[in-house]
């Protein structure tokens, strides 16, 4: 039986990969929602604003036949409290639309992350487990999770949430993307004739880190949404093993034909404005895709990730126990995604 997926946020790193993966299987009809005019190939894309409840309820036919809904989008706001309120409203709007038009709804899935455990606020217990205490509030994960559980009570459909960490993948026009940032950063330093210094702090260079590829996350989202054992469950999902940037960085440098170096002396937001004028020249020199640098990278986002001084780690035991055994080798995955960026003329 063909399932029908609704992917809200099909233009983002996670949503784009999930929608593409589902469409490629041939077993799913995929409807994508986002603000961009187009979605991934094979996806019926709708340019809708998920915060406009009246407009959504005016189009119940848009989600007719949807059996599985995946919320991969996030609405940004000025502060954490406002962001929590906004994203809870986004979830309620999605469920209202589904209840109006998707009579056969079976499952609603959310993508959250290890901020659930407070990884952004300071040292936390590692490896983190799904039943560990919540980190500091406000955080929109908590508001969405509580709202989802409340909306599901007494309904035939179930839910799941996945908690990845630092998703590796890419989507055009998304600045909050670590692998694209690394690629652009390396291209700029190479054009300047410099070594590839690590773009973070000495502590971040040495600490235990983890990541989740968008490919792996897409597979896990589809699995959790269709496995009876995952009904109403929260699941950590990372590549598997942890890593240290000091061990991966030489491979990144080799990919770009550069000599690796240790941590840079300045944070990205101070360092990179001096190099940004080189980007148009790099685009012309290597025939890269057109577009402004700010559409590819957000130095503040990268600086935040590369400044964390404490260990990160999540236990994937629950997902494995319930049946998801796939994992990724961190070095192989990072180089594969950089290769895809090069293939698509995003970085040289």
Where are these regions (language model features)?
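NAD(P)H-binding glycine-rich loop region in Rossmannoid oxidoreductase-like domains
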Residues: 38-39, 47-93
């Amino acid at each position: 039986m063909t399932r029908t997926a609704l992917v809200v946020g099909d233009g983002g790193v996670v949503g784009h990969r999930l929608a593409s993966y589902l469409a490629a299987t041939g077993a799913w009809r995929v409807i994508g929602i986002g603000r961009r005019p187009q979605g991934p190939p094979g996806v019926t894309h709708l340019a809708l604003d998920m915060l406009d409840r009246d407009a959504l309820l005016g189009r119940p036919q848009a989600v007719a036949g949807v059996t599985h809904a995946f919320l991969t989008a996030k609405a940004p706001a000025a502060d954490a409290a406002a962001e929590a309120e906004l994203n809870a409203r986004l979830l309620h709007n999605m469920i209202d639309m589904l209840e109006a038009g998707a009579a056969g709804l079976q499952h609603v899935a959310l993508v959250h992350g290890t901020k659930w455990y407070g990884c952004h606020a300071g040292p936390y217990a590692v490896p983190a487990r799904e039943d560990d205490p919540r980190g500091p509030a406000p955080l929109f994960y908590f508001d969405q999770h509580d709202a989802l559980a409340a909306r599901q009570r007494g309904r035939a459909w179930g839910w799941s949430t996945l908690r990845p960490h630092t998703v590796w993948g890419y989507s055009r026009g998304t600045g909050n993307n670590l692998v694209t940032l690394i690629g652009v950063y390396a291209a700029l330093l190479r054009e300047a004739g410099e070594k590839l210094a690590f773009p973070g702090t000495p502590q971040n260079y040495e600490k235990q880190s983890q990541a989740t590829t968008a490919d792996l996350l897409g597979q896990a989202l589809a699995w959790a949404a269709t496995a009876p054992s995952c009904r109403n469950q929260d699941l950590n999902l990372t590549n598997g093993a942890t890593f240290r940037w000091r061990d991966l960085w030489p491979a990144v440098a080799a990919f770009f034909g550069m000599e690796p170096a240790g941590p840079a002396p300045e944070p990205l937001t101070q360092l990179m404005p001096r190099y940004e004028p080189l980007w148009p020249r790099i685009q012309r020199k290597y025939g890269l895709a057109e577009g402004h640098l700010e559409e590819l990278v957000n130095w503040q986002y990268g600086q935040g990730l590369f400044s964390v001084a404490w260990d990160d780690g999540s236990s994937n035991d629950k997902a494995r126990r319930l049946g998801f055994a796939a994992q990724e080798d961190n070095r192989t995955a990072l180089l594969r995604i950089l290769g895809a960026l090069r293939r698509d003329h995003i970085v040289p």
